[in-house]
Amino acid sequence: MLIVMNRGCRLVSRIPLGFRRLKRNPNPGLRNILCRRYSPLALSKEVTEALKNNVPVVALESTIITHGMPYPQNEELAIQVESKVRSMGAVPATIALLNGQCTIGLEQFQLSELAKSGETAYKVSRRDLSYVASQRLNGGTTVAATMILARAAGIDVFATGGIGGVHRGAENSMDISADLIELGRTRVAVVSAGVKSILDIGRTLEVLETQGVPVVTLGPPKSAFPAFFSRESKFQSPLSLETPQLIANMLFSNIQLGQECGTLVAIPTPHHCSIDYEKMEALIETCLQRSVQLGITGKNVTPWLLGELLRESKGKSLNTNIDLVLNNAEKASLIAKELAVLKEKSSFFPTNTGNTFETKPVKQDFFYGKVSDKGVSSSKKKITETTSKPAEVVCVGSVSIDSVLKLDNPLTSKFLGTSHPCHSEQAFGGVAHNMALASSLMGASTKLVSCVGTKSVPTSSIKEYLTKSSLQHTIVEKSNFTSCSYTAINDCNGNLLLAGADMAIMENLSYSEIKDDLNDAKYICFDGNISPSLMLDITTSKSSKQRVVFEPTSGPKTLKILKVLSVASIDFITPNKFELDVLFQAMKDGNFFENESWWQKLNSFGITSSFYNEIERFTKSTGIEEITENGILQKCFHLLPFIKNIIVKLGPNGALLISSEKLQGVNSNSASLFTPGNVTVKYYPVPKVIATPVNASGTGDTFIGTFTALLSKGWGMDDAIDTAQKAAGLTLQCNFSVNPEIKTLLK
């Protein structure tokens, strides 16, 4: 018997279709023959998902790999830089041209092959992009080319070592880097250790001023502009700001103003690796004179000079170069994270503002047309609402038409890829709808808050159904969207094999459209289909007496709650084992468990070594070894400082409660544990009410709706969870998303 089976989902990318990542053959020397048409831009899956969900992304250039240093040091540094970005909670996007395809986010084998290619790869600036792409060549991108491709993908922050600039003697040679011109017309923040010190820093700053490029140094007022190898040059920085957050505010203002210029963010070289400015100047002058004598010009000057400095400094310049690149990546990640928060909270900022290859100014009405978090909603939106007594439970999320196909016979692998006899059923569903319906059937005053599209057939059916039902609801109509739909394929026992969900419309529901519906609620439940910004607004805007319940819905959608957990805590989460694993790993990778406040909170729970001895007794008494074998308890303890109550749905094995609150109605028995710090752990086995399983879809939703309704009516925790499991079991035995008979459990 399987009580809990959350529905799968199809993630709908906001990246323009032509820019989605194409399948690549693991051999980078072969053309991609799997694609029907050639796309100039390929985003990795990791970068695509990050951009779609407003996870901070940091672009990284690749000339440092192809032309910056020899193999294998170049590959080692590239891996270190990406690891640094990830450790700071951002997603790295190394950019390069592979077989002519502009690739945003390299796989490990691609990074390795590029590092091995070295200077046989092209050094690609703006002028080289079309040639290298058309000839299907490999290339490392300079600052200019990386900016262009980052902007096309919608990446706002780019970390590098140092930018190009005005070469010494440029009054005669006219040797001025394209990086400076690009900064004047491509809106990407370039985080670097200033300008490469082999260049003319003073004239470079003058050109940047002419191009209208803001130049800001991370540091106190009137900071010196850094000189790459040296922490300070003899030139004062045009602007100075003391924290990454202040710099992010500046970048966000640049976006709001609709400017298309980039920003140069200068990061002073760390003290421990900085080289004395005067000593480095003398060494550079010697090397420059030698380059003139040898006739080295153009784009060959910089790599030659860096090689000479490495030799003359006996390796110190390389060590400094590596340290400053890692330092820049760290600071860029912090800035990107702060900028992502600002974008998430903004009332008009879209999730992805990439422009394709054209870097034309983005019209302001494009921004304002986006449904926002707390901003003013469009007056063109039609809102249909039922009115009744104030709702104690409000469920925010999807309402859909669910199609369930149950196979007549067992499925074997040799019969995949063909049709099978089955029985089909259609019903109205959606996670929030099912939770609301279950809550209403259990006697709680409940309201569903959702939206429907105007361009799909199911819309009229959904509206008609809700109008005739007794379920209170607020439905927002959105033009040019399709309503939610869900299709599940179950095996002959009713267990889910595969499902597809089209819930894209829910990403466009805004807080301003529904905030009045939340005022009277004791419990606000939302599913994983709504946007991270709406989750954040609901959580941060609720009153102190209101409780928030998050139903993850699926593994990928579980990660939407990270934006909330970075700034606030939530009251309840109801993951299954897979969703718990996904959330734990993401928080671990995002360094949620590294700050001092987390340690202090965890220590206050009193989870000592003696308590772990109690866990062994607890495991034996419950007979559920997976609680410890799969690390479920340990993962929940890690999450507890962020989430007050965690109910892990164990499918046929029942449910597990972990709470940091003093709960009502939790009786002590052999299946319960209590720490000195008021942490409660209790296992709830499955009630013996299940006959023949028919349909697992909706069982988890029924559990949560019933559980929340009973809490709102003052039930204790034990009774609420036991009854919710019985309700889920009744739904398992029918073809409805919620079995109407669950109301008999109140008798």
Swiss-Prot record:
Residues holding substrate: 123, 143, 177-179
Residues annotated to bind Mn(2+): 175
Stretch list, region Pseudouridine kinase: 380-747
Alphabetical UniProt keywords: ATP-binding, Cytoplasm, Glycosidase, Hydrolase, Kinase, Lyase, Manganese, Metal-binding, Nucleotide-binding, Transferase
Active site per database record: 61, 196
Keyword Hydrolase part of the UniProt annotation: yes
Alphabetical list of Gene3D superfamilies matching this protein: 3.40.1190.20, Indigoidine synthase domain (3.40.1790.10)
Annotated segments matching region Pseudouridine-5'-phosphate glycosidase: 1-379
Compartments, as annotated in UniProt: Cytoplasm
Biological-process GO terms, alphabetical: pyrimidine nucleoside metabolic process
Molecular functions (GO terms): ATP binding; hydrolase activity, acting on glycosyl bonds; metal ion binding; pseudouridine kinase activity; pseudouridylate synthase activity
Cofactor: Mn(2+)
Catalytic activity: D-ribose 5-phosphate + uracil = psi-UMP + H2O; pseudouridine + ATP = psi-UMP + ADP + H(+)
UniProt EC number: 4.2.1.70, 2.7.1.83
CC terms in the record's Gene Ontology section: cytoplasm
Keyword tRNA processing assigned: no
Coiled coil stretches, renumbered: none
Listed HAMAP family: PsiMP_glycosidase
Function: Bifunctional enzyme that catalyzes the phosphorylation of pseudouridine to pseudouridine 5'-phosphate (PsiMP), and the reversible cleavage of pseudouridine 5'-phosphate to ribose 5-phosphate and uracil. Is involved in a pseudouridine degradation pathway.
Family: In the N-terminal section; belongs to the pseudouridine-5'-phosphate glycosidase family. In the C-terminal section; belongs to the carbohydrate kinase PfkB family.
Protein name (Swiss-Prot/TrEMBL): Pseudouridine-metabolizing bifunctional protein C1861.05
